[in-house]
Amino acid sequence: MTEKRFFSSDDLTAAVNVLSSSPLEDGTWAVITDATLFHPQGGGQAGDKGRLGAANVLKTVFNEAGDIVHITDADVAVGPAEEAVDAASRLLNSRLHTAGHLIAETGAGFGWHAYKGDHRAGESRVVFKAPEGVTTAPQPADWQPALDKLIAAALPRRVTVENGSRSVTWGDLPATHCGDTHVKNTSMVGACRLTKMKLKKGELSVSYTLDN
């Protein structure tokens, strides 16, 4: 199984060993390495893009065996290679995912329990279970000040990896199990705006966007 270097490193470049490179029907290639800094699509987060050897990494996914597969636009020779994650897309993905955690924490302060989310650009939302007896959705303006306060606090990220299980939090906030990428402190999220709150069948969907 591919070593997930992004679990414990924010580096964007590294030397890796290409184990296989297989052509796909659409003309792209599926490349597997012994280890990678590339975060695959999953956990509600988009996969990283970048370069592997001389090839462009178009997206990164898991295969059925649990290996991380780099989908590239060209063949990559088996053996040593250099990889480079696209910095801009990684930062955006990390900001969006971190914002999702902070929205979950904001909701918890009002008695709502977050249990899933989608942190892709243009689709970003966090879904909460409604407190017992609550039938009316809050408004974005009700939560926005608390979210803004968490972001402005510049709380430092804390990551723990034990027996392959990874937990993340910022400052003294409660830790959650998460294998995705996040910014180093909450201020790096930047301006995050709650755009819509919809309550249906006991679930509150909170949509959000980054303003820059």
Features from the language model and the residues they span:
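Active-/binding-site microenvironments in catalytic and ligand-binding cores
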Residues: 1-212
